Amino acid sequence: MIVRSIHLGFEVPDTDASMATLYYAADEGALDAARLTGLVAADRSGSPWPLVIVLPGINVAPDSYRWLAIRLVRAGYCVATYANIGSLGPAGRGITPGVDMAALGPDIIASHCSATALGPLLDAIADLDEPVQGLIDFDRVAIGGHSAGGTVALHNTDPSWVSGLVCAFSFGGHTMTSMSLGHGEASVTAVPSKVPILLLAGADDGVVAASRDRYRNDDQAHDPVRRTFDEAIHRNQNDSWLVEIAG
């Protein structure tokens, strides 16, 4: 088995462009037949594969997650990374995970799906032909991401919002919500948590530390990832975890 990828575009409302890369297990014995097209037939031995969708951080190119996609494919998954080009508010336009900011206001947050890219991306993947047609298990979908991508994943942990969702993960993401959206200082928003959740955090995350002014003006300890685990996940089924990584 070798890891190969195919590329696709998909449409998300109110964005400039959206592009994805789908990594899959390919048949090394089919390389000769793919010399002219570059499209290598799938290794069907482990199919149907669960699908993992990796949501990007702000202005983080999806190729930054290629290493993770390759490892997950080798472990038996099919993996999609993507870039959604849209508004960054005062910062202009750039790569986002795709989020409906209006859905994050204090009166409406957690009441409906805020991930604008996931539905269109799932539809686009389902419409693909060879080499992955019929080989992806759309009843076993995991979503997860880094930084803002992880936050969007956490806010959408409801299978009625993301078809086939069975679990979610986040690295450096949390649900302490910006005061600019009308939330109180240092407030943590509960998430649906209708599936198991894995939270990963760096023990000394400089990005999280540098962004504290978005969430609070006081001088209290700032650990939004741990607070998200303690206060936002109301699952209570012993199937969610917080993992702190040194560094």
Spans of model-derived segments:
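Residue in the alpha/beta-hydrolase core beta-strand immediately N-terminal to the catalytic nucleophile
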Residues: 140-142, 167
